[in-house]
């Protein structure tokens, strides 16, 4: 199976960034940072994100985190 980005996984399920944030107990800004590679996603959040979207960790293509 081809890898899918965090944003694509979320959109595929019809969820908004706000809905993901609410369910994970983080801010919408954090979800945006994960999706754009501005912040590294901790494994526990990745697991929960995958559970919400129906994808496995192996299906997700995480963006490279920028060090700027």
Placement of each model-derived feature along the sequence:
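Residue-level detection of the helix-turn-helix DNA-binding "recognition helix"
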Residues: 11, 25, 36-38, 65
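Short alpha-helical DNA-recognition segment
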Residues: 14-33
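DNA major-groove recognition helix of helix-turn-helix/homeodomain DNA-binding modules
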Residues: 44-59
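Short amphipathic recognition helices of helix-turn-helix/homeodomain-type DNA-binding modules
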Residues: 59-68
């Amino acid at each position: 199976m081809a890898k899918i980005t965090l944003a694509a996984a979320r959109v595929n399920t019809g969820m908004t960034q706000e809905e993901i944030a609410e369910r994970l107990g983080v801010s919408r800004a954090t979800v945006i940072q994960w999706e754009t590679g501005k912040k590294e996603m901790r494994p526990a959040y990745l697991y929960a994100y995958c559970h919400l979207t129906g994808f496995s960790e192996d299906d997700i293509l995480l963006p490279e985190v920028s060090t700027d």
